[in-house]
Curated annotation (Swiss-Prot):
UniProt name for this protein: Carbamoyl phosphate synthase large chain
Residue sites binding Mn(2+) 1 per the record: Q284, E298
Residues annotated to bind Mg(2+) 4: E835, N837
Superkingdom of origin organism: Bacteria
Ligand binding (ATP 1): R129, R169, G175, G176, K208, V210, E215, G241, I242, H243, Q284, E298
Keywords: Amino-acid biosynthesis, Arginine biosynthesis, ATP-binding, Ligase, Magnesium, Manganese, Metal-binding, Nucleotide-binding, Pyrimidine biosynthesis, Repeat
Subunit-level organization: Composed of two chains; the small (or glutamine) chain promotes the hydrolysis of glutamine to ammonia, which is used by the large (or ammonia) chain to synthesize carbamoyl phosphate. Tetramer of heterodimers (alpha,beta)4.
Residues that bind Mn(2+) 3: Q823, E835
Length: 1067
């Protein structure tokens, strides 16, 4: 039992949905913390709204409440479960803010709940900008000249006093939300207004900019006895001015002198002692590159994105140790699981280099402002480990899955030196490639350092890489000798990069490596620089001499992970990968994971028998397979990242378990799939590929509007749009053919029907459908952005029978062994198939949890040769539960300047929440609350701007809203129609007309909800785009689908928002 015998039942608060600034790292830390508590015999009650997480599984906590993370709902959980303690530091900013709110509202005192780990007072001192600054002054730690600002005028006055540029840092926000650098008064007014609105306490720190100084981070641990260690220090390659979440980070720091390192280490320990942290803490410093002057930027008094990175970089389990400290243990009493000999008070040492590179979502948001600053915009990140910086860096580049294997980027070749300089001085997500092009053209390193703030050490490394690339380009395969190839491999060059530059195939380089015996060795991440023997089977590749992998003769399977979190491929696939690993280990099969994401549970070395932290490219995966010689490889759970390796592995005669490469092709190739549907007599929306505007218009006239148009090769609905008439179609096709005239545009009849989705399991003979899901928004909204209901609420028994029949026919005809995801449309009483994915999908965690069927476990056992009828869950459609569960998408568009907000065929959500209720209205209300959507609880003024095709339907909803007490503001046309329908509506002027116009009302927050159905989504020149953006940036609700608005109307008519709602333990 723990040292503190009073702790028997602990409430752990999770971090909620994945959003920019708060991603999978909190599932990793939360899972680790829950396991650490259970190890001590403590009952764990978890509350988290995100169903896609491992931490909300029944194996991780004793009680799981998938409920909204609000004071109201968490109080209900506390009242029902009566925990004696609360662990707040594992749920990111969300968990921290909620713990402070529960404390300040007296709820923790009311139920006698003690906060364990870092106290509320210490959290406040770390998070409140004024308290933190005062504390730093008391302990003589330098802070940047700053002022706490709570109103605009005071901010302007302070900026005039200290001079521009200034940095705006809102209190209690996530990922720098609402903040930024202001170079002049006009920019300050805009940024400060946003920051004050988005801070939960209306407080902003305005500070003198030290843009260009080095940004250094220390991850520190402290126990309640005052023992303190630094786990890891990290250096941002990008200087201060770019959010650390958007910076390339290297560990350990590469450019600090011993004096600088020790100076900042001592400062970190002084700060963590002064604040009174008990657990983990991240300290960020700005360091003047020309002197020993430094300043404390901020601390995070909790586990964070950086602590997940530090954990994976060192092998030191920060969240687990923090949880043990919260129970009263000292660092000298907690065993290091990696070595099994040393204790947590032993500081890790690294004999390798780790590089983290962010993964940005700009492929999904073509019009987005890509400029990087103090507001975080990355959705995820990759980590790479190498025996030198260059090797780790190049591994990182190829791990990003952006089609780059070196520092060369075609788009920068034609830019002038002036244009390149502009791209480097005003950094964006592609700056590193522009910088490499400057070095390629001979730009002096000292000048590049001066204009970028990047240390000469890193620039010299980049220059060496660029020079080697140039040498290769000027050579042939005959010039390549063993010595040169070995040098290139040691510095991280992939076979593909070398082959591309020598204009040969990667197989040719692989063949030479085989002849010359140039094979990677695998080293262990051991926390102690080889000083003690390690037990952890956690490896990275290097081309040095000694190999530390022990290859067994056991039956073994490789599981390919899903790589970095990005829109369309999120934490759901890590969930599936981890469950696959658990299922294999239960069958006593040696399980090997390959992945490169430092935020996830799958890259926790305790999850699998062996973990290879490597890029998910053909070469890197093949090297591991060559080494381990597994009995099979599983690709089904790693999303598109894993599936796209299927063809390559087949060519290399490597067995994949479950569905084969040919079967994947059958499902994903449009022509083959259309032939299959015809043979099976299954309908799909009519359509074809067109090559010109004229052909497109002719096909549209044949099919009849509305029409769904999209490029022929897309993922995640990229570039899809619904057009309602010839004018809209002409606009789309003209732009599409201008961008790409070499591929056809697909034109399908758009069926405005109900979308239905299933995740099914097949063993080649039978099929099990754990549940039939219904989408709330009609077809045309990407399935990942739709509200999803289970059990389905509006589907007839006849359609359910057809769903099962079509699922069976498709799964058995394709030859699925394992998982299949199918999306249907029900239109005018008939069922159509719109998409088949021969793998796990993003709905797997949701349907697993709410149906009670362990989908991934069953699918994995089928891949190993078992049959559905022997696994205890039957076949056909599984029985429906009593409770209704609604999955609601969550968006991060507020954090991405100039991106589209409206729902459509292209996926934009970053995460999801679950709402569980006795009926669909209760579940929807909880889902809306959990997703921070508009619920009508705070204000009832609606701005309506509705396109002509939607006006008739909107008028019916407006009548209901009018009866519910809503007020309407509308532009001339809509206002006139509302009045004609007997609804009072205030008229407002359009954008660009004299004040007060629409924009004035939004800026003054005189509107509570914007209902805007877009005429042309993604067109940033149109009024609708500006209205949606202005509203979302001011935390005003926006609905662009009348189906979502109808759901709001129905739950209000049912009074779900006024009921005393229950909370449900899903175990």
């Amino acid at each position: 039992m723990p040292l503190n015998k009073d702790i028997k039942k602990v409430l752990v608060i999770g971090s909620g949905p994945i959003i920019i600034g708060q991603a999978a790292e909190f599932d990793y830390s939360g899972t680790q913390a829950c396991q650490a508590l259970k190890e001590e015999g403590i009952e764990v009650v978890l509350v988290n709204s995100n169903p896609a997480t491992i931490m909300t599984d029944k194996e991780i906590a004793d009680k799981v409440y998938l409920e909204p993370l609000t004071v109201e709902f968490v109080e209900k959980v506390i009242e029902k479960e009566r925990p004696d303690s609360l662990l707040a530091g594992m749920g990111g900013q969300t968990g921290l803010n909620l713990a402070v709110e529960l404390y300040e509202k007296g709820i923790l005192d009311k139920y006698n709940v003690k906060v364990i780990g870092t106290s509320i007072e210490s959290i406040k001192e770390g998070e409140d900008r004024e308290l933190f600054r005062d504390m730093m002054n008391r302990i003589n730690q330098p802070v940047i000249q700053s002022e706490i600002i709570t109103d605009l005028d005071a901010g302007i006055a302070f900026a005039r006093k200290i001079g521009y540029p200034v940095i705006v840092r809102p209190a209690y926000t996530l990922g720098g939300t609402g903040g930024g650098i202001a170079n002049n008064e006009e920019e300050l007014i805009e940024t400060l207004t946003s920051g004050l609105q988005l801070s939960t306490i209306g407080q902003v720190l305005l500070e003198k900019s030290v843009k260009g100084w080095k940004e250094i981070e220390y991850e520190v641990m402290r126990d309640s006895f005052g023992n303190c260690i630094t786990v890891c220090n990290m250096e941002n390659i990008d200087p201060v001015g770019i959010h650390t979440g958007d910076s390339i980070v290297v560990a350990p720091s590469q450019t600090l002198s011993d004096k600088e390192y020790q100076m900042l280490r001592s400062a970190s320990i002084d700060i963590i002692n002064a604040v009174g942290i008990e657990g983990g803490c991240n300290v960020q410093f700005a360091l003047n590159p020309h002197s020993f002057e430094y300043a404390v930027i901020e601390i995070n008094p909790r586990v964070s994105r950086s602590s997940a990175l530090a954990s994976k970089a060192t092998g030191y389990p920060i969240a687990k140790v923090a949880a043990k400290i919260a129970l009263g243990y000292g660092l000298d009493e907690i065993k290091n699981a990696v070595t099994g000999m040393t204790y947590a008070c032993f500081e890790p040492s690294l004999d390798y280099v780790v590089v983290k590179i962010p993964k940005w979502p700009f492929d999904k948001f073509q019009g987005a402002d890509r400029a990087l600053g103090t507001k975080m915009m990355a959705t995820g990140e990759i980590m790479a480990i190498g025996s030198n910086f260059e090797a780790a860096f190049l591994k990182g580049i190829r791990s990003l899955e952006i089609g780059k294997y070196s520092l060369e980027h075609k788009k920068f070749k034609d830019l002038s030196m002036y244009e390149l300089r502009e791209r480097v001085v005003s950094p964006d997500d592609e700056r590193i490639f522009a910088l490499a092009e400057m070095l390629r053209r001979g730009y002096r390193i000292d000048m590049v350092s001066k204009i970028t703030g990047i240390d000469i050490f890193f620039l010299e490394k980049f220059r060496w890489l660029v020079e080697e690339e140039q040498k290769l380009k000027q050579s042939t395969i005959d010039d390549l000798n063993r010595e040169w190839l070995l040098k290139l491999k040691r510095r991280g060059f992939s076979d593909k990069a070398i082959a591309d530059m020598l204009k040969v195939s990667p197989d040719e380089i692989y063949r030479l490596r085989d002849i010359w015996h140039i094979k990677p060795a695998y080293k262990m991440v051991d926390t102690c620089g080889g000083e003690f023997e390690a037990l952890s089977p956690y490896y990275y590749s290097t081309y040095e001499q000694y190999d530390e992998v022990v290859v067994s003769d056991n039956k073994k399977v490789v599981v390919i992970g899903s790589g970095p979190i990005r829109i369309g491929q999120g934490i759901e696939f890590d969930y599936a990968s981890v469950h696959c690993v658990m299922a294999l280990r239960k069958q006593e099969i040696e399980t090997i994971v390959i992945n490169n994401n430092p935020e996830t549970v799958s890259t926790d070395f305790s999850i699998s028998d062996k973990l290879y932290f490597e890029p998910l490219t053909e070469e890197d995966v093949l090297n591991i397979i060559d080494k381990e010689k597994p009995d099979g490889v599983i690709l089904q759970f790693g999303g598109q990242t894993a599936i796209k390796l299927a063809k390559f592995l087949k060519e290399k005669n490597i067995p994949t378990l479950g569905t084969t490469s040919d079967q994947i092709d059958l499902a994903e190739d449009r022509e083959q799939f259309d032939d299959l549907l015809e043979r099976l007599n299954i309908a799909r929306p009519k359509g074809k590929g067109v090559w010109s505007l004229e052909e497109g218009l002719e096909e549209a006239r044949r099919l009849g509007f509305p029409i769904l148009v999209r490029p022929s090769f897309v993922l995640g609905g990229q570039g899809m749009e619904i057009t309602h008439d010839e004018e809209e179609l002409t606009y789309y096709l003209t732009n599409a053919f201008e961008k790409d005239s070499k591929n056809p545009i697909l034109i399908d009849k758009y069926l405005m029907g109900r979308e239905i989705e299933v995740d099914a399991i097949s063993d080649g003979e039978d099929v099990l459908v754990p549940g039939i899901m219904e989408h709330l928004e009609r077809a045309g909204v990407h399935s990942g952005d739709s509200i999803t209901m289970y059990p389905a609420q509006n589907i007839s028994d006849k359609i359910k029978e057809d769903v099962l029949d079509y699922t069976k026919k498709l799964a058995l005809s394709i030859g699925i062994k394992g998982m299949i995801n199918i999306q249907f449309i029900e239109f005018e009483g008939k069922l159509y198939v719109i998409e088949v994915n021969p793998r796990a999908s993003r709905t797997v965690p949701y349907i697993s949890k709410v149906s009670g069927v362990p989908i991934v476990d069953i699918a994995t056992r089928i891949m190993l040769g078992e049959r559905l009828k022997d696994l205890g869950y039957g076949t056909g459609v599984y029985k429906e539960p009593d409770l209704v569960s609604v999955k609601v998408p969550v968006f991060s568009t507020q954090k991405l300047p100039n991106v589209e907000v409206s729902l459509g065929p292209e996926m934009r959500s970053t995460g999801e929440v679950l709402g569980v209720g006795r009926n669909v209205f209760e579940a929807l209300y909880k889902g809306f609350v959990g997703a921070s959507m508009y619920t009508g609880d705070k204000g009832k003024t609606i701005l309506a701007t509705i396109k002509k095709h939607d006006k008739k339907e909107f008028m019916e909803l407006a009548k209901d809203l009018d009866k519910l007490g809503y007020n309407f503001i509308a532009t001339t046309g809509t206002a006139k129609e509302l009045r004609e329908a007997g609804i009072d509506a205030k008229e407002v002027r359009r954008i660009g007309e004299e004040s007060p116009n629409i924009m004035d009302l939004i800026k003054n927050k005189e509107i509570d909800l914007v209902v805007n159905t877009p005429t042309k989504a993604n067109d940033s020149k149109r009024d609708g785009f500006h209205i949606r953006r202005a509203a979302i940036e001011r935390n005003i609700g926006v609905m662009t689908s009348l189906d979502t608005l109808k759901a709001l109307v129905e739950l209000q008519k049912e009074g779900a928002h006024n009921r005393e709602l229950e909370v449900f333990n899903l175990i």
